[in-house]
Amino acid sequence: MKTKIPDAVLAAEVSRRGLVKTTAIGGLAMASSALTLLFSRIAHAVDSAIPTKSDEKVIWSACTVNCGSRCPLRMHVVDGEIKYVETDNTGDDNYDGLHQVRACLRGRSMRRRVYNPDRLKYPMKRVGARGEGKFERISWEEAYDIIATKMQRLIKEYGNESIYLNYGTGTLGGTMTRSWPPGNTLVARLMNCCGGYLNHYGDYSSAQIAEGLNYTYGGWADGNSPSDIENSKLVVLFGNNPGETRMSGGGVTYYLEQARQKSNARMIIIDPRYTDTGAGREDEWIPIRPGTDAALVNGLAYVMITENLVDQEFLDKYCVGYDEKTLPASAPKNGHYKAYILGEGPDGVAKTPEWASQITGIPADKIIKLAREIGSTKPAFISQGWGPQRHANGEIATRAISMLAILTGNVGINGGNSGAREGSYSLPFVRMPTLENPIQTSISMFMWTDAIERGPEMTALRDGVRGKDKLDVPIKMIWNYAGNCLINQHSEINRTHEILQDDKKCELIVVIDCHMTSSAKYADILLPDCTASEQMDFALDASCGNMSYVIFNDQVIKPRFECKTIYEMTSELAKRLGVEQQFTEGRTQEEWMRHLYAQSREAIPELPTFEEFRKQGIFKKRDPQGHHVAYKAFREDPQANPLTTPSGKIEIYSQALADIAATWELPEGDVIDPLPIYTPGFESYQDPLNKQYPLQLTGFHYKSRVHSTYGNVDVLKAACRQEMWINPLDAQKRGISNGDKVRIFNDRGEVHIEAKVTPRMMPGVVALGEGAWYDPDTKRVDKGGCINVLTTQRPSPLAKGNPSHTNLVQVEKV
């Protein structure tokens, strides 16, 4: 049964003023505003920091998790124990200057991670079945010997292609401790000294947008910095929620709001869920069915084209395939974008607002109004987060959303954007070299479970294998460093569980982590890692608008229990594997840091000395070019500064995609197209499976965690409870009240969790914050609220990425 959305719900104008006036959502907006004020009060408290005691040390450390920022933490230590945590106290509130980098509630709770009862204390080996969490304590020497001996046997028997480094972002901001990308880690350096490993491409965050927009712009699609919004007249955010996904100290949300105060730009948010980025600050929220963004864009494009609101001069000069004039000779007649939109292409369907309304759930008159506003307001900052791309049709949807910036000529100008996510300034700080991987073969990061189950069957044309036509061997060993993708963050947990439980398939799993995570329970050998507070490192790679920074992450306390640093672990293994000198080059961890810092000072002359930096804790530098404008050089002179696409221009029509579509072997329902068309993909709103599972389930980044990191911190779990968000209309049909325990289920699994009944969800859609720790009962019903019990391992068509937001479910009261 399809959920009918009342016209009153979707047709109503949702503005800042109207939102606050509305009883139900107004209360939510005011509640959200109260939360914002709370964080403001906490931030102002930094100015009056508590005086330190005479026996108290204040040591700079960092939170290095995968939130988009890296935040400085000033640890107050007495007698070798962290007593409390403060954040950056340098700089001011001026976003035009070297502003403070204020840690969010997660970083400020770092002490609770360091002293968490879940901390891994000793090396252990598995004594029960994988996933049971049954281990016995062993010595470090035994752990090293087991790993070295088994790995050497597996390499001898199956080759280095059988060794896999799993995806992990638990400490991706580190330098020595860096966990992502796996190819830039110390584990990769160790394996490269030993003949290499099976690599992977893509990532769980942005696989589809990276691959999709590569065929539009060439390479990773750049975006204007959020500070440039001070030059914008309009801000349109498709599934872009920096208020939660970028809520930390780098300050994307801060830049967004400060810049809008200068420009007074209207902000329109298009999202199935009313996010904290709105929270009464937006001018309009347009709820949309998940996975239908491309249909909306097509409807908008129809209005823009028929009402002459497109920038024809820009399209003629900078683009390929908008109309017949720039269509490649290899393309079929009427194979251009304009023909597709007007119904003159192969499908013969005009993409009118009425057509788009039936798919998206957005009233046609609202689509017309939005098209006219976008088409007549310039410059406009049009961007997309990474939510819309995490769908079965994600690659093609990202190309479609970028079309709004392209059609209106907003690319390469101040106040505009490319349609991609916001960009930022970065420093050329030198990272730990990991040497060259002798193995050229790679798979999608999402298909490692398939590579265990059916590795030799996986091919380039069917499964996206790169570097050779097919895999020769299955994965026989996994290194899982600082990551929870072994089970918790990987889709379709029950299938993964079945594959991993058979230790004759993947014969050795080594997990290196600080806590007993859901993934750690599947280890054969479990190695206790040091936290960032227990070792020295540099922290960087923050998305921070026009200011970049590096943090001196000093050792705050001695390693707890028998924990060791990743450098010490890999150095000891290198010794047993006969590659110690090649691996360490005779340096300790601190000596490597001093060496890398000396190289970095050559690239960044303003850096202070090592000892001065250690004392000051953070180095900040603003972009000397001012606001970052993506593709500015291309816009100014496309001949001298071509893009890296085959044509050197923006490719609306991609011949490369046409060639892939003609040669790849795709399952029924998967579509790769040279144009940014709308295709529903599998498990969409229009899928016949909707009759059995009538609700779309989507995920979102929850503010109490960074993916699954901090998911075991009690105060954060209490402050931001894990709940399933559901619209009152859907809840009423099912007899569900706020706080009721519900079961969410489909053919892949079942989750029991409390319901949050709220008008902040679009009818027909439910949502779970991703990253909650998997907690199954004896029947494998999850009680932790882990969305990946319900997600699918069927990959997206082009990137072979994770379609985590493409799910059909049913919900019932328990």
What are these regions (language model features)?
Residues 333-334, 338-454:
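Active-site phosphate/pyrophosphate-binding segments
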Residues 507-508, 555-574:
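Phosphate/diphosphate-binding loops
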Residues 168-169, 317-320, 374, 417-427, ...:
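A glycine-rich phosphate-binding loop feature that marks nucleotide/adenosyl-phosphate handling sites
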Residues 566-616, 708-710, 714-725, 729-814:
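Long, contiguous, secondary-structure-rich segments that constitute the structural scaffold
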Residues 282-288, 548-559:
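Short beta-alpha connecting loops at secondary-structure transitions
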Residues 2-309, 335, 354, 460, ...:
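N-terminal export/assembly segments and adjacent metallocofactor-ligating motifs
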Residues 273-377:
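Long, well-ordered, tryptophan-enriched scaffold segments
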Residues 2-7, 182-270, 277, 295, ...:
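Extended redox/cofactor-interaction regions of prokaryotic respiratory oxidoreductases
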